[in-house]
Amino acid sequence: MKKIAIRIDDIGASAKRFEVYSKRRIGNFLFLKYLKPLKAWGPYREMVAGEWGQVFKILHRYGAKLTVGVTASWVEWNGKLVPFPEKFPDEAAALKEGLGQGILEIANHGLTHCVIGKHLPRLFFSNRKYHREFWDWIPRQTHFMHIKQSQEILQDYFETPIITLIPPGNVYSSDTLEAANYYGIKTV
């Protein structure tokens, strides 16, 4: 029998709210990026606890396991960080239940998913490049700080070692890999 493994990212990521861009360059002007014919991405909502229950039923039915990339903190408009379990307590509890059932792996999807201070929608262009947390132009100490803090939040709440990192947008650098290794991550 073959095993099925699947992955979902952006759980708890404020990129859902703030990363907005158009399919066309002209579409990034003012409000146009929000219009359905031009919109390529964002905003979209967080899955709610009841929806996770439906996902769990499907996973059990097919003997599948889901890797869930959780962004450890939501970034508010003002740049304040709110840990995922505080911002979304019901959803966090649902994920903890799925972890306990052995059908989920919780993966680190970064602390913020974005470059703080540059995460808000722009009037005249896309903000897409600022919704990747581990660019090579981000200072080394930021990579280490973000991996450390996200590991602490996720491991404290889920009470299990977090050994997988899914970098937002699959963007990472050698600093990211060093930080991940230092804080116990085995798979990127």
Task: Enumerate the language-model features and the residues they cover.
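Catalytic alpha-helical scaffold of carbohydrate-active enzymes acting on polysaccharides/glycoconjugates
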Residues: M1-I163, N170-V188
